[in-house]
Design a protein with these regions (language model features):
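Bacterial N-terminal signal peptides that target proteins for export
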Residues: 2-15
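A structural signal for beta-strand register positions
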Residues: 97-99, 130, 159-161, 166
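Short, intrinsically disordered, charge-balanced linker/junction segments flanking boundaries
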Residues: 30, 160-162, 169-174
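Hydrophobic alpha-helical transmembrane signal-anchor segments
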Residues: 13-24
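Sec-dependent signal peptide cleavage junction
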Residues: 22-36
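Extracellular beta-strand-rich solenoid/capping regions of secreted or surface-exposed proteins
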Residues: 75-92, 100-128, 133, 139-156
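Acidic Gly/Asp/Thr-rich repetitive segments characteristic of extracellular carbohydrate-active
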Residues: 35-70, 75
Length: 174
């Protein structure tokens, strides 16, 4: 009977040890990060559920800021960022090694990922600051083209693919 109690105590101690180990692991390790982008301004980082929300917030800022992609942007949601004359922002888009695809059809009203309207003072710079420096940058795929007019668009590395199936593309601009 003494041997039996020792075996029961051993099993109980192993079980309690396993429970303690799992209870010490933070739950955030198991949580999926659903945020697509973050905005950094003056060393303050705010994460957003969508890239569109991040750009909407960044356009309102007067200080230079960085929109950083946190996960691949693929799917049916269309990113349509329009910079207007009221926008006086300086945004750096860090693709962070991810691809960005804007899936549009000819029937959709907003065929462009980024549109700069006449009179805007907005600046957009695209960079890749991922840890994997072998990758030059993300891939921007615009099935219906993109409009950049009266503005400056910088892209440091990566690939910009524009299919002319109804969009205006990049024309007569920097």
């Amino acid at each position: 009977m003494n041997t039996n109690m020792t075996l029961e105590k051993r099993i109980l101690s192993v079980l309690l040890t396993v429970i303690m180990v799992f209870s010490m692991v933070p739950l955030s390790v198991f949580a999926a990060d659903s945020n697509q982008a973050s905005v950094t301004v003056n060393e303050t980082v705010t994460e957003y559920a969508t890239i569109q929300e991040a750009f909407d917030a960044a356009k309102k800022l007067t200080d230079p800021c960085t929109v950083k992609v946190l996960q691949s942007f693929k799917g049916s949601m269309v990113l349509g960022v329009t910079f207007t004359a009221e926008d006086n922002c300086d945004i750096t888009l860090d693709v962070n090694g991810f691809d960005m695809y804007n899936r549009n059809t000819r029937d959709q009203a907003s065929a462009s990922m980024f549109t700069f309207e006449k009179g805007t003072n907005a600046h957009l710079t695209v960079v890749n600051n991922s840890e994997n420096r072998e990758t030059l940058g993300g891939i921007f795929y615009y099935p219906n083209g993109t409009d950049i007019s009266n503005s400056v668009f910088y892209m440091e590395g990566g690939t910009l693919t524009i299919e002319d199936v109804g969009g205006d593309g990049i024309k007569n601009k920097t």
